[in-house]
């Protein structure tokens, strides 16, 4: 039994009693990385020397018994800036970018005394659903190395599933935490928009992006979200909402819980094996005293189209800062300022990023703004209202995290429309800004299936309660890939 088979709470107790040291945990991480990283490719940059340095300091100072995360190893998605540790967003244009400040979540993790093992692979600028658009390498799913881990936080999910780190941070713009968590058989939470500061997150679509935790179990996830949540003066979209002790909500009691199951989430396009796993999960929740009804989110069908117009439009604006002048890659072949801009961006961005920048610029252009961008915003309002309507009568909404299990590497990379349609069950949640968690709920042909539990605004505690009650009745979260 490896050290990472223990939960956060169990490891904390061992650290406080000095049965193990932070140095032991960091060693466990790097030994595992040495053993499996060549197969999975979770990381872009390792932080080995600094990690062992912090571990020794914490070992000498002693673990704070009131600090649940002290001395525990974490991996951080490579679009979250880390002072003096290369941060690339998996793009050539930021290949050698060395940030001069920490993201707010990184500062909070340092205050919590976690130990950063390294920066995790992702789709370039978080644009993708498979971690295949990374400039550096493709990440492989630990359950089947011929398949994708999901995306864009594929490295964050694969590192946890492969036991390279205890937990990780990802970001979720249209499903980028929940879908890889589902594909890799781990737990991933997308918090309410504004719950976690985005300061220091390299922006893709600012009205949709949200940072969240990926862990092996629900309790660990709750501890990590507690540590990174809260108002931040550096992020005007962060919301002044009290940071609850999410871990206190894990009572196992969900008697009387009212679940809405959208007919749109179990219809055509959802794999039979995925659908069956979700229906079985609903039976488990019924046994625990919950009830469920079929409901409708009628505007879900417009989710993917609206999302790709809005997200791409915001990306075309956000990514205009990468111009070869201030930081990042600069084309050596330019002789004029105009050439510097065009060549730097043509050479520095990958195909998918360029595709979305062009799509967004087109949607925002004169003559098309009303037809595309404005229409997408109107559809977003309707999608948001769908959720508001259902939550008037139901406590949570439940469905699959993804319509399929993990697909083959290179299986969809040249078919962007099919790839985009994979996000059909996750993008409405980002458009509405509500929280959702993916928890393992079974297997289909040996591949993990994720159950998506969606809550009303700032009801993460309820999501954790439901997810934890389900987890306690099942063993799916204890299953591990054979690497």
Curated annotation (Swiss-Prot):
InterPro entries given in the database record: Amidase, Amidase_CS, Amidase_dom, AS_sf, GatA
GO molecular-function terms, A-Z: ATP binding; glutaminyl-tRNA synthase (glutamine-hydrolyzing) activity
Cellular component, GO annotation: glutamyl-tRNA(Gln) amidotransferase complex
The keyword Protein biosynthesis appears for this protein: yes
BP term (GO), one: translation
One Pfam match: Amidase
Gene3D superfamilies: Amidase signature (AS) domain (3.90.1300.10)
Domain of life: Bacteria
Reactions performed catalytically: L-glutamyl-tRNA(Gln) + L-glutamine + ATP + H2O = L-glutaminyl-tRNA(Gln) + L-glutamate + ADP + phosphate + H(+)
Enzyme Commission (EC) number: 6.3.5.7
PROSITE patterns: AMIDASES (PS00571)
Alphabetically ordered keywords of this record: ATP-binding, Ligase, Nucleotide-binding, Protein biosynthesis
Residues annotated as the enzyme's active site: 77, 152, 176
Family as reported in the entry's similarity comment: Belongs to the amidase family. GatA subfamily.
Quaternary structure and interacting proteins, as annotated: Heterotrimer of A, B and C subunits.
Function: Allows the formation of correctly charged Gln-tRNA(Gln) through the transamidation of misacylated Glu-tRNA(Gln) in organisms which lack glutaminyl-tRNA synthetase. The reaction takes place in the presence of glutamine and ATP through an activated gamma-phospho-Glu-tRNA(Gln).
Protein name: Glutamyl-tRNA(Gln) amidotransferase subunit A
Species of the source: Listeria monocytogenes serotype 4b (strain F2365)
């Amino acid at each position: 039994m490896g050290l990472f088979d223990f939960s956060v709470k169990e490891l904390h107790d061992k650290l406080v009693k000095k049965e193990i040291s932070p140095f032991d945990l960091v060693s466990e991480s790097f030994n595992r990385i040495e053993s499996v990283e060549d197969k999975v490719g979770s990381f872009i940059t390792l932080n080995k020397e600094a990690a062992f340095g912090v571990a020794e300091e914490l070992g000498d100072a002693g673990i704070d018994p009131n600090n649940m995360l002290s001395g525990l190893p974490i991996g951080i998605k490579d679009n979250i800036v880390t002072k003096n540790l290369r941060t690339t967003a998996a793009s050539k244009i930021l290949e050698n970018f060395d940030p001069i400040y920490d993201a707010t979540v990184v500062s909070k993790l340092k205050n919590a005394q976690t130990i950063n093992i390294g920066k995790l692979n992702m789709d370039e600028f978080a644009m993708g659903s498979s971690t295949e658009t990374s400039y550096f390498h493709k990440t492989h799913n630990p359950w089947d190395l011929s398949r994708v881990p999901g995306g864009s936080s594929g490295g964050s999910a694969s590192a946890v599933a492969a036991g390279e780190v205890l937990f990780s941070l990802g970001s979720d713009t249209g499903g980028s935490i929940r879908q890889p968590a589902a594909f890799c058989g781990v737990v991933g939470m997308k918090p309410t928009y504004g719950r976690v500061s985005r300061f220091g997150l390299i922006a893709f679509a600012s009205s949709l992006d949200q940072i969240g935790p990926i862990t092996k179990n629900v309790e660990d996830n709750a501890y990590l979200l507690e540590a990174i949540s809260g108002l931040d003066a550096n992020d005007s979209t962060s919301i002044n909402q009290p940071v609850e002790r999410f871990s206190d909500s894990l009572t196992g009691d969900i008697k009387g819980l009212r679940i809405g199951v959208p007919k749109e989430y179990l219809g055509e396009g959802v794999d039979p094996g995925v659908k069956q796993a979700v229906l079985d999960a609903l039976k488990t929740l019924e046994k625990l005293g919950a009830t469920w009804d079929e409901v409708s989110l009628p505007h879900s069908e417009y989710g993917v189209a609206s999302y790709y117009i809005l997200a791409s439009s915001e990306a075309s604006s956000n990514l205009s800062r990468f111009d070869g002048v201030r930081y990042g890659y600069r084309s050596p072949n330019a002789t004029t300022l105009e050439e510097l801009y065009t060549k730097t961006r043509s050479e520095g961005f990958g195909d998918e990023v360029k595709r979305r920048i062009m799509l967004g610029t087109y949607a925002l252009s004169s003559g098309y703004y009303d037809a595309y961008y404005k229409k997408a915003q109107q559809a977003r309002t309707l999608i948001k209202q769908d959720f508001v309507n259902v939550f008037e009568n139901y406590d949570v909404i439940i469905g699959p995290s993804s319509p399929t299990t993990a697909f083959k590497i290179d299986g969809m990379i040249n078919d962007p429309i099919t790839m985009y349609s994979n996000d059909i069950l996750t993008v409405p949640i980002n458009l509405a800004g509500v929280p959702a968690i993916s928890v393992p709920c079974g297997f289909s042909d040996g591949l993990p299936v994720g159950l998506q539990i969606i809550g009303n605004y700032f009801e993460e505690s309820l999501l954790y309660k439901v997810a934890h009650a389900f987890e306690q009745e099942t063993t799916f979260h204890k299953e591990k890939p054979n690497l």
